């Protein structure tokens, strides 16, 4: 074996070539209005009720599991708690995918961690682009299932904000039966709880649901997520999860957030976010620099601008940090705006109002131009 003085040469080739997921915090910025990470804009207050920091925590804290199971309407044996839903994404790959042999499948534009997690473990990333209306391309999925072990579907989808048709989700589950796990990412489901498919678990043994406390529960800094599945899958995931995934303070606060009082507070936050979302969606229509505001079932809006790079910089310079989505398929000139407080939403509109519109139709890629939701260059909502 050849020797090298560069220790990075010792790393796996796929890791050396890996482009890491660029989280909102990695991208940085010096703003005071953070609307780029789909966080709740205000802090929450909790008091620790236990001080047993000298002892290792339980792998699966009973009080957290039982409270989330009650909240989700499931038996405790169908719930696993982890360091955010991102760890749940990774656990599925570790448990079900053979590196260098199996693949995962997802449908861009969607959440970026599916791809990064697969690449980290040496598992093929297979993409089937969403259709023009951002729904699933079922025939294409059916034609790309060879060696696929996990299919990830985000609903509501990040960054587009739309729900995936339930009939299409059932079709994917049927296509994958006996072949692959179907993981439905419900990170934003609290903003549209009627759309949850958790009651399908009894009918589909290959269904997994990913959840989090980062969004509506306003605990992004806690790093606490949940995987819902049949007990056989949960037992497999317990084989590969870290021995102490949740620290004692995290488990303590998570249990408080899942108390009846905590759940009621979460629902009040959801109501507030919905009201601010409706206000911002309406106000954006009057901005000359806005081409399209896409209807969302989540805590963010996807907006197509006439010149998104200019808009992004103008707001950045005013301390308002948004999320650029230009590199996602079909999202040319699109920025994602997290729903902040009413005051923060008003600052966004105040910054956008002076900006003139630009005829940028020639710069929108062909996929965007044929997108049924944006087939005409005009303002509106969908």
Swiss-Prot record:
Annotated Pfam families: Aminotran_1_2 (PF00155)
**Any single GO BP term:** L-histidine biosynthetic process
What catalytic activity does the UniProt entry give for this protein? L-histidinol phosphate + 2-oxoglutarate = 3-(imidazol-4-yl)-2-oxopropyl phosphate + L-glutamate
| Residues bearing PTM N6-(pyridoxal phosphate)lysine | 215
Sorted keywords for this record are: Amino-acid biosynthesis, Aminotransferase, Histidine biosynthesis, Pyridoxal phosphate, Transferase
Looking up SUPFAM superfamilies in the UniProt record yields:
PLP-dependent transferases
Domain of life here? Bacteria
Q: Which CDD domains match?
A: AAT_like
InterPro entries from the UniProt entry: Aminotrans_II_pyridoxalP_BS, Aminotransferase_I/II_large, HisP_aminotrans, PyrdxlP-dep_Trfase, PyrdxlP-dep_Trfase_major, PyrdxlP-dep_Trfase_small
Q: In which pathway does it act?
A: Amino-acid biosynthesis; L-histidine biosynthesis; L-histidine from 5-phospho-alpha-D-ribose 1-diphosphate: step 7/9
Q: Tell me, how does this one assemble? A: Homodimer.
Matching NCBIfam families: hisC
Q: What is this protein called?
A: Histidinol-phosphate aminotransferase
Identify the species of origin. Answer: Yersinia pseudotuberculosis serotype O:1b (strain IP 31758)
């Amino acid at each position: 074996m050849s020797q090298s003085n560069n220790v990075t040469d010792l790393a796996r080739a796929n890791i050396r070539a890996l482009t890491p997921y660029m989280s909102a915090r990695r991208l940085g910025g010096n703003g005071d209005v953070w609307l780029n990470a789909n966080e709740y804009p205000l802090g929450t207050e909790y008091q620790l009720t236990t001080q047993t920091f000298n002892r290792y925590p339980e792998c699966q804290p009973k009080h957290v599991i039982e409270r989330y199971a009650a909240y989700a309407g499931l038996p405790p044996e169908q719930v696993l708690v982890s360091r955010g839903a991102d760890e749940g994404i990774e656990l599925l790959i570790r448990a079900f995918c053979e590196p260098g042999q199996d693949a995962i499948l997802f449908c861009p534009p969607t959440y970026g961690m599916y791809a990064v997690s697969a690449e980290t473990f040496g598992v093929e990333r297979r993409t089937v682009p969403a259709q023009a209306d951002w729904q699933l391309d079922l025939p294409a999925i059916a034609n790309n299932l060879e060696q696929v072990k996990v299919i990830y579907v985000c609903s509501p989808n990040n960054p587009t904000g739309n729900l995936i048709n339930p009939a299409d989700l059932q079709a994917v589950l049927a296509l994958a039966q006996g072949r692959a796990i179907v993981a439905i990412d419900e990170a934003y489901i609290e903003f549209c709880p009627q759309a949850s498919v958790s009651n399908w678990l009894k009918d589909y043994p290959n269904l997994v649901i990913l959840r989090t406390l980062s969004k509506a529960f306003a605990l992004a800094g806690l790093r606490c997520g949940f995987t819902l599945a049949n007990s056989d899958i949960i037992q497999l995931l317990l084989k590969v999860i870290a021995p102490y995934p949740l620290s004692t303070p995290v488990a303590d606060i998570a249990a408080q957030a899942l108390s009846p009082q905590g759940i009621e507070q979460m629902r009040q936050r959801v109501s507030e976010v919905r009201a601010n979302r409706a206000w911002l969606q309406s106000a954006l229509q009057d901005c000359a620099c806005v081409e399209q505001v896409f209807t969302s079932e989540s805590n963010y809006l996807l907006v197509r601008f006439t010149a998104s790079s200019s808009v992004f910089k103008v707001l950045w310079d005013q301390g308002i940090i948004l999320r650029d989505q230009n590199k996602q398929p079909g999202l040319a000139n699109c920025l994602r705006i997290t729903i902040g407080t009413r005051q923060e939403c008003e600052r966004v509109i105040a910054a956008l109002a002076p900006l003139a519109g630009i005829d940028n139709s020639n710069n929108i890629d062909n996929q965007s131009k044929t997108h049924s939701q944006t087939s005409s260059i005009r303002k509106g909502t969908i």
